[in-house]
């Protein structure tokens, strides 16, 4: 295999693909370059298929520290578990490439993407998608389609294709679309809040203010309306169609000889299918009417047992696995036919109907803010905890040399018992991180941009029958309100579904787990009354036209507004939590911040211990934030700090070099004695200048509070050096 290099300049990306250069024993591999970024993508396949009817695909996106000329921090100097960005990127690549595999392909496949050189301007998610796609397309697995990824930003009201990371900082839209020449496969979107300065009419300027206009700022959530979103997706789709066609044309000559792996045939025993349809249609319809997954599974097992018993009594073959497969196929048909033929869903709802919702707030007395949000048989207990700046999550990005901090976190937990399964509760998996990230993207635009503390939302999914991430968003918004976070708007989330037979199309509002499993689309939308703040869409049927997308968005808006009505009613009945911390914000002279901190932090530590408060200081602006559980102690701490700040500035006393003074021993340390001089200023008597002979233990000679005679040897500003008369004798 000869090395082949393909360069493609498209959609504001300059890409170089180097094939047959690295990892030649893999099924497919590529070295991908964009700017200074270099990624290695490799695909491997096990030629022994699994027995289960699913594709065992594993995607790993990995960032190496050396790619940014860094050594891993901490005690372990090698890469360990993946960070959140790596996990979320792995998930995006998986969701984008999984639909490319042919039906009946049940062979274990691993796709590994490794960043070996970084670039501070390169979008690593788009780069990872393109590198993984190239390695898969040219592999001996013989995938027939290539995908392309496009990120769309909006800067100064203009849509921008594949903005650099610097441009993304200026954008109010983050839209990632992945698709092939024929279809859109995956969409992720989030709105990005910004601050806007209001224009003040000249005749509104108060002459008493000296004719100087006031600067008024307010936060724009930058929600996206339906029409603007469809336009942005259409803008991305056009670029994807062109790019994927070019990728296929350029990569096809590099494709390896196919392995010729056989695909599992999806055989349906037509006779058994007809038998079940004729004799058990009512039993199946009754079984699927149970909304809970565990109950439905139990009822379907009973139907299966009845079928097997009947077949055996008639002298027919009754293979348990075969009956289960055919019964599951018939169940799916029943669910879909009810929707398309009658406009009725398995639980009896209409297509546009939202499940019953109940909301309880601040049900946990020791928590800052809480909400128990129940929609049908999906239930989330969401809590909000408020902290200081020091509570922010610190992390690193391979594209940035500086340590990052995250002061708004959403953690989503999905225990097995929420779906009736006996599972050990361990560390969060990819799905939990993904759902938490979706909820964060939905809520972040309404959190004050300049929020000066830290917020942690935790969603405990107690029961799940679809849309648990959307319940997290709804419960999270109300938990934030319960914690008295000054949010711009309430946010609600709703999951939409789609069922089609190619001719007829039914859009479903607020889908449950059964409809997610047997439907053709999972479309999660969250936002305020003004528009969409976050969206996630995975399409199973191969594509979606813009007309159907518009219908889904309109129906989602109706469902979202209905949920917001209920949330607003719950907010009116909300009572403040007794556990909320008391906070005080005020300003002092920035030059006095050093006095508040004190030497080596002694003063601020004393304040924290005495008044049981936490303190955040802004050294540049003189801002002070106090937090504590006792309102009176917080007020007393404020008074104490203001007293220090308002105290007159003492001028540093000028001591006469060579003159003898009597001071007090303030503190004894290993290297000397801190002496309180006349007028209260401190000076250092070094251990080497206590006596002519070597002194090993100062505590044998002096005690704190003792008077001590010293001679000033030197003074440089506030730094005063001393010696004893004994040393100078």
From Swiss-Prot:
Principal EC category: transferase
Gene Ontology BP terms: mRNA catabolic process; RNA processing
Physiological role: Involved in mRNA degradation. Catalyzes the phosphorolysis of single-stranded polyribonucleotides processively in the 3'- to 5'-direction.
EC number(s) reported in the record: 2.7.7.8
Residue ranges occupied by any S1 motif domain in the UniProt entry: 658-725
Gene3D superfamilies with a match to the protein in the record: GHMP Kinase, N-terminal domain (3.30.230.70), K Homology domain, type 1 (3.30.1370.10), Nucleic acid-binding proteins (2.40.50.140)
Family (UniProt): Belongs to the polyribonucleotide nucleotidyltransferase family.
Keyword field contains Heme: no
Protein's organism: Sulfurovum sp. (strain NBC37-1)
One cellular-component annotation, GO: cytosol
Cofactor: Mg(2+)
Reactions the enzyme catalyzes: RNA(n+1) + phosphate = RNA(n) + a ribonucleoside 5'-diphosphate
Record keywords, A-Z: Cytoplasm, Magnesium, Metal-binding, Nucleotidyltransferase, RNA-binding, Transferase
KH domain residues: 581-641
Compartments reported by the entry: Cytoplasm
UniProt name for this protein: Polyribonucleotide nucleotidyltransferase
Pfam families (alphabetical): KH_1, PNPase, RNase_PH, RNase_PH_C, S1
Binding site for Mg(2+): 516, 522
Signal sequence range: none
Superkingdom: Bacteria
Gene Ontology terms for molecular function: 3'-5'-RNA exonuclease activity; magnesium ion binding; polyribonucleotide nucleotidyltransferase activity; RNA binding
InterPro entries membership: ExoRNase_PH_dom1 (IPR001247), ExoRNase_PH_dom2 (IPR015847), ExoRNase_PH_dom2_sf (IPR036345), KH_dom (IPR004087), KH_dom_type_1 (IPR004088), KH_dom_type_1_sf (IPR036612), NA-bd_OB-fold (IPR012340), PNPase (IPR012162)
